[in-house]
Structure formats: structure tokens, C-alpha cells
Swiss-Prot record:
Pfam families: Glyco_transf_11
UniProt KW Transferase keyword: yes
Record flagged with keyword Iron: no
Top-rank taxon, per record: Eukaryota
Protein species of origin: Caenorhabditis elegans
Protein family membership: Belongs to the glycosyltransferase 11 family.
Positions glycosylated per UniProt: 60, 128
CDD domains named in the record: Fut1_Fut2_like
Protein name: Putative galactoside 2-alpha-L-fucosyltransferase svh-11
Gene: svh-11
Assigned GO CC terms: Golgi cisterna membrane
Membrane topology summary: Single-pass type II membrane protein
């Protein structure tokens, strides 16, 4: 009898456990469905931004480290600025740079940077997880595009120095490091640029970068076809190339825009076709490598474009022209968030329209 009751108890208990598991499974699926629905309906939940658990770190080591908040959801040009600046700051402060993989965007950023500048990322210690609460945050870098002296950081003796800023878009954070950063570009990438011309004794290559896309959406100054065309005329008149053929290579995020205003241009995929104007359809890393090897002169037509900035910085000729941001009505510049001498290297040349009633381009 006792055995019977015991077996009955086990049967009921097992059934209860089974029912509980069924309920839990249904709750989990209902929760997942609700999350997906609300994400689709209200577009507010971003799975990529969900924080990872805190990284495991050790204290009382013999090293000192430097890390920062990162605009990891931004595009490649912004990402390179942040990493190059942190590397430059870490060298100045004699610290080891850290990269915390805080969420899905950080993971994507890391993957893209490893493809583009693997040797630079080898300089960083990579930690899988968010910044632990045991690391305090140090205020630094209040705006995107200006330089703040690191002298205040020199006094900090914390083992882990974590900065509050983002973007770090100033060449002054990595001065005199151009050759080193160029060498960090991925050397294993197959340097086949399609139909794009090669800079040599026969050809002089001018590289023109444009940016439309989200610049139009967010009311940043996007590339203006009138400025692009007239600035190219300015360069043709002022850049002496001797007997070499002039070749113009266009880079940009809006193929329709480029084909509309440069209808005679051929694509980099149009193998065998010869022309004066070409449009690159290559991946970003190939565009950087092409610039390193072939861009004698660079024209940046969207002055806030960080990708265009790096095309100029990595360029073979290290001779860069850009639309003077003072004449674009850029709200970041006008609010003091961008200082031109911090953002643009001093040997780069600003251009502008000659007057409000003229499309002739002149030096600013």
C-alpha cells in the first residue's frame, strides 16, 4: 500500500513538473513573440544594442590600460577615427589600449576594423563584455570634432582609465603617425581594382569623394554636383601634370547620383573600357588601398564625411582639397562642435565658391 501511494505521488509529481515545463516553454515563446511584435510595431528595441554581461578583468596588474565609450553603430570612417585616436592617446600616455565588446554593434565594429586595419587592432587588448562597474568613467572629449589636450589624463594613475567621450575626430590625437597608420591597412587584401586607372608615368589620378545617403536625411551638407564639377575644373587648371593623362576616379555611396551628373563615367566593373571619369564600385578596404597607391590628388566634396577624410589621409600624393565647412551652414561647426584646424590637417586646402552669385571654385 505504501509503495502504491509512493508511486502515485511520483506520478503526480512528475506530471506537475512536466506541466510546469510546458508552461515555462509557452511563457518563453510568448515573451519572444511579444518582443518581436513590439520591435516591429514601434521600432524601438534594437537587439544589437542590448548590453553584454560585464567583462572579466583583473586588478593589481603591472600594466595600465586605456579605453573609451565608442560610437560603435556609426560607419567605418567614424570607427577608424575612434580607434586611431585611442591608439595615439595610449602611446602618449604609455598605456595599453582596450576594446570592450559591449554589444552587437561593438562586435560588428571589431569585425570591420579587423578586415580593414588588422595590424592596428592587434595593438588592442580585446575583452568580451561590457565595461564593469568597478571601472569609473573619466570625463573627456565633449564633442565629436575637436581636440582636447590629454594633459589632464597624464595625472590619472588609475589602472583602468575609461573615457566618457566618443568619435575623437581630430588628427591631433595621432600626430606624425600617418605612415604607421597607412601600414596598418590590410596587406592581405587582393589589390585588384577592376577597371580603375593606375597612377604612373602615363596617368595622373584625381580622386573625388562624394557623400549623399544619410547626410541628406539628417540635413548634413551632402555633396553638391555644382561644387563637384567646378572643383574638378579648378583642379584641372591648377594641378600641373605635365604630359600625363588626367584620370578622375569618383567614390561615393549613391551610384545613381554619380551616374546622373557624370554620365560619361565608366564603372570599375566595366573591364576594358577607357575613359576620363571612373566610378569605383569596390569595397571600402579596396578604396583605401587604391587611394594609398594611386590617388595623386583627393577632393572631398562633403566636408563632414569621415570616409572621404580617410581617403584623403591615406592617399598616395597626400595632397587634399575639401569644401570649406565655414560656407556650408553646418550646425555642428556653427555650434562649436567642430574646430576646422582640429579636424582638417593644416596642409590640406579648403575651397569655396567665388561668391553667392558664382559657381566658380576658388581657394578659401
Amino acid at each position: 500500500m505504501r509503495l502504491f501511494h509512493f508511486l502515485k505521488f511520483l506520478t503526480i509529481n512528475n506530471f506537475s513538473r512536466y506541466c510546469l515545463k510546458i508552461v515555462k516553454v509557452h511563457i518563453i515563446w510568448i515573451t519572444i513573440i511579444c518582443i518581436i511584435y513590439f520591435n516591429w510595431r514601434f521600432k524601438k528595441l534594437d537587439f544589437m544594442a542590448i548590453p553584454y554581461p560585464p567583462a572579466v578583468i583583473k586588478f593589481n596588474t603591472s600594466a595600465k590600460y586605456l579605453s573609451s565609450n565608442l560610437a560603435s553603430s556609426s560607419q567605418l570612417g567614424n570607427n577608424i577615427f575612434e580607434i586611431a585616436s585611442l591608439y595615439g592617446l595610449s602611446k602618449h600616455l604609455n598605456r595599453t589600449p582596450l576594446f570592450f565588446i559591449e554589444n552587437g554593434y561593438h562586435k560588428k565594429m571589431l569585425d570591420n576594423l579587423r578586415k580593414t586595419m588588422p595590424r592596428l587592432m592587434e595593438k588592442f587588448r580585446i575583452l568580451n563584455g561590457s565595461v564593469p562597474r568597478s571601472i569609473s568613467e573619466t570625463k573627456f572629449q565633449r564633442a565629436c570634432c575637436l581636440h582636447k589636450s590629454p594633459w589632464s589624463l597624464e595625472k590619472n594613475r588609475d589602472e583602468y582609465l575609461h573615457l566618457s567621450g566618443k568619435y575623437y575626430q581630430s588628427w591631433k590625437y595621432f600626430p606624425n603617425m600617418r605612415n604607421e597608420l597607412i601600414e596598418f591597412l590590410n596587406p592581405t587584401s587582393i589589390q585588384i581594382f577592376g577597371n580603375l586607372p593606375i597612377s604612373d608615368d602615363q596617368n595622373h589620378v584625381t580622386c573625388v569623394h562624394s557623400r549623399r545617403g544619410d547626410f541628406v536625411e539628417y540635413l548634413f551638407y551632402a555633396s553638391d554636383p555644382k561644387f563637384m564639377k567646378n572643383a574638378v575644373t579648378f583642379l584641372n587648371e591648377n594641378e600641373k601634370v605635365g604630359s600625363r593623362n588626367r584620370k578622375i576616379v569618383l567614390f561615393g555611396d549613391d551610384l545613381n547620383f554619380l551616374e546622373t551628373y557624370f554620365s560619361d563615367a565608366v564603372l570599375s566593373t566595366d573591364v576594358g573600357k577607357n575613359a576620363e571619369y571612373y566610378i569605383s564600385q569596390n569595397p571600402p578596404i579596396d578604396d583605401f588601398l587604391y587611394s594609398k597607391n594611386n590617388c595623386d590628388v583627393v577632393l572631398i566634396t562633403a566636408p563632414r564625411s569621415t570616409f572621404g577624410w580617410w581617403i584623403g589621409y591615406f592617399s598616395k600624393g597626400n595632397k587634399v582639397y575639401y569644401l570649406d565647412i565655414k560656407y556650408t551652414g553646418d550646425h555642428i561647426f556653427e555650434s562649436g562642435g567642430l574646430i576646422a584646424s582640429d579636424f582638417y590637417p593644416s596642409h590640406w586646402t579648403p575651397l569655396k565658391f567665388a561668391s553667392a552669385n558664382s559657381f566658380t571654385v576658388v581657394r578659401s
